[in-house]
């Protein structure tokens, strides 16, 4: 009999875990397959870990991995993928914003329709702040234009994948991970299920605008070198502009033209060019930071406690 592993990252989700488990059990009963939960505690400060322990004592199909500190959702998903033993592996959020009933369609899509992955995307962003929705849409359009990653607008991490696809994802051992980009980069035959946005069942989101901005910038850096090309172009244009302004000084001197205004103009242009150069250096230094981080070869996460095996 085949087996499904569902990875559930958790960070301060004490209000959601049992609600999620109870809803999922209704779905599990309809699946004619073995099933395991892999809850990943991402350094929570509340009772998340103790609830995981309690569920594991009641249900042998509940596995948990607890980090020594907060490493982020990307690390939690990676740890879950490494711990999963199923023939089919899924990712879900614990707040029930990922409708559990879609798992039945996902399983059918892989087993009966031959897909390697059945993923989900939101058709609406109802309930989100307008500014957040605006930047999210711009991000998807931008990263698809400047990178070789294929990320569907509104794509969620919620998906079910074959073991072959999961092994391909795990073969990419980069430390600073951007899973949405990785899912698209590895390819495979993917079917998309659409649904309208669902509110959290309890608790509050852990994704602030600052975290989302950092996540987006990290994704662009992971899958595109376009910012470096833009920096190079800006540097060349700045240098040409500088040469043009120097030439104008010589022309004014040669023709005895009064140019005090030009001096002020040159000063302002030099300030502008300096700021552009600093911006270019900032872009390049961010890429160097990523290279430095990879070169240290530190683990993506550190396990503090678990009741399963993490490869």
Residue ranges of model-derived segments:
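Conserved amphipathic alpha-helical interaction elements at protein-protein interfaces in regulatory
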Residues: 26, 30, 54, 58, ...
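Solvent-exposed polar/charged
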Residues: 57, 82, 108, 144, ...
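Acceptor/aglycone-binding surface of glycosyltransferases and processive sugar-polymer synthases
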Residues: 65-69, 73-83, 88, 100-179, ...
